[in-house]
Amino acid sequence: MVKSGQIRFPDYRWGEDRLFIFDCLERAGSVAVLPECKYSYIMHPGQSLISSYYDKKFEVCLAADTRAQQLCRRFGAEDDEDFRYMFAKSVFSCLTTLFSPGCRLNRNEKRDVIRGIITNEQLRERSRKPFGGAAVKLLSAVMRSGSVTLNYAAFRFVAWAGQAAPRFFTKLKHRK
């Protein structure tokens, strides 16, 4: 199915592809790297899955991280720093998209979502030893602070910075 391009995911969701890949890895008897790409995204002009608000994004983020941790344990990975980095960036996306034009939540609803995210035990555990550059470490510390107001202000600023200086923002967020 993979070789013939027969796998399709629902349009404009977040995370189904990661969960599918993790499920496949867990069930695979062997894994081979194909010489050409068999995976392509359909990108709609002006839209990005990372920058779009999706109300279940954090739930999918937690599920993908849980699966990644399970696979690391199963295959005896010494360190899961790349997965911790991916998780941190995914959570940052959950928080910054609260301030995107597509998010219709009011201020109090956004604060409730932030509270739910920053008090989540999995997030608190995984953000203790963040892997990444200064931006990842700083934003992880903000999340661990437990302050809804600080997180609201910080991630609102991050969302604004991403719109005001997208190239600089992209370089900064991809620094490991």
Predicted regions mapped to residue ranges:
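Conserved nucleotide-sugar donor-binding catalytic segment
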Residues: M1-Y54
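Catalytic-loop motifs flanking and including active-site residues across diverse enzymes
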Residues: F20, A64, F87
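Alpha-helix boundary/capping detector
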Residues: A28-G29, I50-S51, C94, S140-R144
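Catalytic core of nucleotide-sugar-dependent glycosyltransferases
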Residues: E36-P45, S51-D79, T97-R124
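All-alpha amphipathic helical-bundle segments outside canonical DNA-binding/catalytic cores
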Residues: E78-M86
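Amphipathic alpha-helical repeat scaffolds of TPR domains
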Residues: Y85-T97
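Membrane-interface aromatic/basic loop that binds lipid-linked glycans or pyrophosphate carriers
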Residues: G102-K176
